[in-house]
Regions:
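Canonical helix-turn-helix DNA-binding module
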Residues: 74-114
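Short glycine/proline-centered loop/turn elements that form peptide/ligand docking sites
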Residues: 54-58, 93, 98, 117, ...
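Alpha-helical linker/hinge and terminal dimerization helices associated
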Residues: 37, 41, 129-144, 156-170
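C-terminal regulatory/oligomerization modules of transcriptional regulators
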Residues: 1-23, 147-174
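N-terminal leader segment of winged-helix/HTH proteins
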Residues: 1-55
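Charged, amphipathic alpha-helical coiled-coil/dimerization segments
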Residues: 97-151
Length: 174
């Protein structure tokens, strides 16, 4: 085992060696993998969206339309942003306006609040996206037999997001 290899004996792959001190090597490796995963996931979402007939949607638009369709309940922009862990309501608001122009969502006023619902066009898009996803991604992942592990990874990633949120708050007080 070389000095750069981790305890598991593998050579860490990082994108920013200046951040990969001995104590932070594993974290740097995770962050690089997370960056690669995020970029691949966004590329996948756009490819799936294009195949489903909506090439003009950004990754955020795709997340927002699926979130609005989730459980087929009306949602406020703040609810969508909170669920997706997005601080900048403006980006979600812009996305919702775009989705409304494309007739994928519609708005309804209830008192002081505006709620958004999926339209029949939006529902058709989301369902077609789901079918393409199952055909191209879910089937491919089945061959790896990692369903239980993916659930564990998802739990770990949600937990880590809390650490990053706390560290983000802490760094602002430095």
């Amino acid at each position: 085992m070389t000095e750069k290899q981790g305890q598991s004996g593998h050579m860490p792959i990082v994108s920013s060696s200046h951040l990969a001190s001995n104590e932070a090597m594993t974290l740097s490796e995770f962050e690089y993998a997370l960056t690669m995963m995020n970029n691949a996931f966004q590329r996948w979402m756009q490819s799936c969206s294009t195949t489903s007939g909506m090439s003009e949607l950004s990754p955020l638009d795709i997340l927002v339309v699926h979130n609005i369709y989730h459980r087929n309940r009306p949602k406020r922009i703040a609810d969508v942003a909170f669920t997706l862990n997005i601080d900048d309501l403006h980006t979600v608001s812009y996305s919702v306006r775009k989705l409304a122009k494309l007739e994928l969502v519609t708005s309804v006023r209830q008192g002081k609040d505006t709620f958004y619902n999926i339209t029949p066009n939006g529902e058709a898009f989301c369902n077609h996206y789901r079918d393409v996803r199952e055909q191209c991604l879910v089937e491919a992942l089945k061959t790896m037999n990692i369903n239980d592990q993916l659930g564990d990874v998802a739990t770990l990633m949600r937990t880590l997001s809390g650490f990053y949120d706390q560290a983000s708050r802490a760094v602002r007080s430095l």
